[in-house]
A protein has these predicted regions:
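Residue in the alpha/beta-hydrolase core beta-strand immediately N-terminal to the catalytic nucleophile
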Residues: 65, 101, 124-127
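N-terminal cap/lid segment of alpha/beta-hydrolase-fold proteins
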Residues: 1-19
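Conserved catalytic-core motifs of eukaryotic protein kinase domains, centered on the activation segment
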Residues: 46-48, 72-78, 137-139
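Conserved acidic catalytic loop of the alpha/beta-hydrolase fold
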Residues: 82-99
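Helix-loop "lid/cap" segments that line or gate small-molecule binding pockets
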Residues: 153, 159-168
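Flexible "cap/lid" loop of the alpha/beta hydrolase fold
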Residues: 113-118, 122-155
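Gly/Ala-rich beta-loop-alpha elbow adjacent to hydrolase catalytic centers
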Residues: 104, 108, 112
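Conserved HGGG/HGGXW glycine-rich cap/lid loop of the alpha/beta-hydrolase fold
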Residues: 15-71
């Protein structure tokens, strides 16, 4: 089982994008590669630390911090999932990864799907964990997500007869 000394952690420059943090196993360079993509508000280390050693017994493992997260590319504007996917592709190319399996957890799932959609030449498969097809609800759904907490709190203080009338 790999130890901490069998991992490398470094920042790499992504041409035209900025610098990002990468952690990779030093195992067999010929082993299949897993590219781990983390969830919203987390980092690669936070989401994947407990799996590094087990996965690296059979795979080469690469983990990054996404655009605007942890030590990832510094975002001057709100990050978009497509930026995260393109950053991952740029990392793969900088590391000379021919083909890899993208493993996406939570927000990493749509990133993996965008990565495959935009860079099929380097993604040979996907593993999607606790995720969705997209994370940006449209129109009324977006409004309902924003208003829902307010309505929930109003329901706690509104008189019962008002709640019953509204429910009809």
């Amino acid at each position: 089982m790999p130890t901490a000394s069998e991992w490398t952690e470094h920042k790499i420059e992504l041409p035209g994008r900025g610098r990002t943090f990468v952690r990779e196993s030093r195992g067999d360079a010929n082993a299949p590669t897993l590219f781990l993509l983390h969830g919203l508000g987390a980092t690669g280390l936070l989401n994947w630390r407990t799996t590094f050693n087990a996965l690296s017994e059979q795979y080469r493992v690469v983990v990054i911090d996404h655009h605007g997260h942890g030590r990832g590319v510094r975002a001057r504007t709100p990050f978009r999932l497509v930026d995260c996917a393109d950053d991952a592709a740029a990392v793969a190319r900088e590391l000379n990864l021919d083909r890899f399996v993208a493993v996406g957890y939570s927000m990493g799932g749509p990133i993996a799907q965008l990565l495959w959609q935009r860079h099929r030449d380097i993604v040979k498969g996907m593993v999607l964990c606790a995720t969705a097809c997209r994370f940006a609800p449209r129109g009324r759904r977006r409004l309902s997500y924003a208003v829902s907490p307010i309505l929930n709190n109003l329901g706690r203080i509104a008189p019962r007869n008002v709640i019953r009338s509204a429910a009809r």
